[in-house]
A protein has these predicted regions:
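A short acidic (Asp/Glu
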Residues: 8-11, 121-128, 147-154
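Aromatic- and glycine-enriched pocket-lining scaffold segments that form the walls
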Residues: 110-115, 120-130
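Short, basic/hydrophobic alpha-helical segments
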Residues: 87-111
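Short, surface-exposed basic-aromatic patches at helix termini and helix-loop junctions that form
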Residues: 105, 125-137
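An anionic, glycine-rich sequence signature occurring as long contiguous blocks
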Residues: 41-75, 85, 89, 135-202
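Short, conserved catalytic/metal-binding motifs centered on acidic residues
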Residues: 1-8, 35, 113-120, 138
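Structured nucleic-acid-interacting core domains from mobile-element enzymes and related host factors
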Residues: 2-64
């Protein structure tokens, strides 16, 4: 998962304006990417990274004067602090993949990788299934977007799957007060089990 670390000092190294979904606007700070192990009772963070966002203009949302005054340091290539700073500029998805692979090598052999909507994509699913020869499974929320899933030999997005299978396979879950459709299919080359869930009347 990732979260916003809001800061007030523009001179901090790697600082940028990042989008805060809770506030609906950009704030000064970092994006914290956290990978944690959960056994049903205890959550143990085992890896993290800080990230900046370049923005549409590639200026991190800062003025020239602010960027010039920001802290800069020369580092030896390959040193831990050099690698950590380079990591700050990498895409979060790329770093998330590295975290999962490091965790497996450390002996954290989870059965499932759970993420939010932003990380649910074919790239991360394929990575998770490749670790430990398929020992881990991926669980994540997905948007009702344009992503195509192959079900019964045909490619359809979520809305099209609902229209095609709601009457035939729609079921009610009284415990969670929802209606759902369960389908087996593929996202690219990765086999997936799809749950299309509707809570309440809307």
């Amino acid at each position: 998962d990732d979260t916003v670390l809001e800061k007030s000092g523009v001179r901090m190294e790697g600082i940028s304006r990042v989008f805060d979904h809770m506030k609906g606007r950009c704030v000064l700070g970092y994006k914290l990417l956290l990978c944690a192990f959960f056994d049903g009772k205890t959550t143990i963070p085992f890896d993290f990274s800080l990230h900046q966002e370049k923005g549409k203009q590639g200026d991190c949302g800062l003025t020239k004067q602010q960027r010039r005054k920001a802290y800069h340091a020369k580092r030896n290539n390959g040193s831990p602090d050099y690698e950590r700073f380079q990591e700050c500029k990498k895409p979060k998805m790329e770093v998330a993949v590295d975290m999962l692979r490091r965790g497996w090598k450390m002996g954290l052999h989870a059965k499932y990788v759970i993420t939010d909507i932003w990380f649910t994509c074919e790239q991360l699913m394929a990575c998770v299934r490749s670790i430990g020869k398929g020992a881990m499974h991926f669980v994540g929320l997905a948007k009702l977007g344009k992503t195509k899933y192959t079900v019964s030999g045909r490619k359809k997005n979520a809305a099209e799957l609902i229209a095609a299978y709601e009457r035939e396979r729609g079921k009610v879950c009284r415990k969670y007060r929802c209606r759902y459709i369960r389908l087996n299919g593929n996202l690219g080359d990765t086999p997936v089990r799809i749950f299309l869930i509707k809570y309440g009347r809307n």
